[in-house]
Amino acid sequence: MVRLVITYDIRKDKIRNKLFRLLERYGAWKQYSVFELEINPVHKVELFHSIADLIEDTDRVRIYDLCERCQGKITELGEVSPDKMQVVI
């Protein structure tokens, strides 16, 4: 498995929403325009192609591949991540 952090800056709402839904299928929404994913290498390649097909030249997507050692050094400060919020009905 590979752990990725993906950030994006997408101008058009329609494309940004599509990218959000795509990334949501693969991982956890952490902050506005930031996702963490843990996927296998085959899905990683598929995801990269899907992102490239979706975005426009003016859009930006950054992908950080986290090594095992780096994963243990993640620090979270402030509000709880959206994926850790609990919904009470």
From Swiss-Prot:
Catalytic class of the enzyme: hydrolase
Cofactor: Mg(2+)
EC id: 3.1.-.-
Keyword tags: Antiviral defense, Endonuclease, Hydrolase, Magnesium, Metal-binding, Nuclease
Positions of Mg(2+) binding: 9
Gene Ontology MF terms: metal ion binding; RNA endonuclease activity
InterPro entries assigned to the protein according to its UniProt record, in alphabetical order: CRISPR_associated_Cas2, Virulence_VapD/CRISPR_Cas2
BP terms from Gene Ontology: defense response to virus; maintenance of CRISPR repeat elements
Subunit organization: Homodimer, forms a heterotetramer with a Cas1 homodimer.
Main function: CRISPR (clustered regularly interspaced short palindromic repeat), is an adaptive immune system that provides protection against mobile genetic elements (viruses, transposable elements and conjugative plasmids). CRISPR clusters contain sequences complementary to antecedent mobile elements and target invading nucleic acids. CRISPR clusters are transcribed and processed into CRISPR RNA (crRNA). Functions as a ssRNA-specific endoribonuclease. Involved in the integration of spacer DNA into the CRISPR cassette.
Family: Belongs to the CRISPR-associated endoribonuclease Cas2 protein family.
Protein's name according to its UniProt entry: CRISPR-associated endoribonuclease Cas2 2
